[in-house]
Amino acid sequence: MCESALLERLVATTSGYPSWSVLRQAVHKRRPVHLAVMVEPFLSYILDGKKSIESRFSKYAIAPFYQIEPGDLVLLKLTGGPVIGCFTTDSVEFVALNERERERLQRHYSVAICADGAFWEARQDKRYATLVGVRDVQILDPAPVAKSDRRGWVVLQTRRASHETDQLTLL
């Protein structure tokens, strides 16, 4: 299913839930919307306010690397389960990883990421990192998402290009 169809279905599915007004407003205002697929305990850490930075590490420069900005809406989906929360992006940092950068991230962000030694060890072969500051966390009524691919991050709606919003009148 393509990203726009996934977003449309999610908006339709959640139309009766007041807690989901944040998504409807984002879609209406063309605010970028992302879907982050998460495992426990990291999902609960965000919802509980313990985790203040969401991190994504990859071998390739894939989403959300250079595809997210402060103010974007991030929906939180449990792996194999529904979307149950969201947050607004507070800050972002994109890092091309090498040993020095990996050590810097570990030294400065382990607490905010809720990362232990095993976390960092599992990411030794990664070449890119995206750090996303978390603010305005909301718990949402659970909503199923018909997502069957293995991507851990999906950009559902991008920023409207300036040429899409500006019209020239020739009168």
What do these predicted regions represent?
Residues 1-31, 59-60, 84, 95-171:
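Contiguous surface segments at macromolecular interaction interfaces
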Residues 32-39, 86:
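Short amphipathic
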Residues 34-36, 50-59:
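Short, structured beta-strand/loop micro-motifs enriched in basic residues and often containing a Trp
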Residues 46, 65-68:
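Short, well-ordered loop/turn sites that connect or cap secondary structure elements
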Residues 77-82:
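Short, charged beta-turn/beta-strand-edge "cap" motif at the junction between a beta-strand
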Residues 88-90:
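Conserved positions in beta-strands of structured domains
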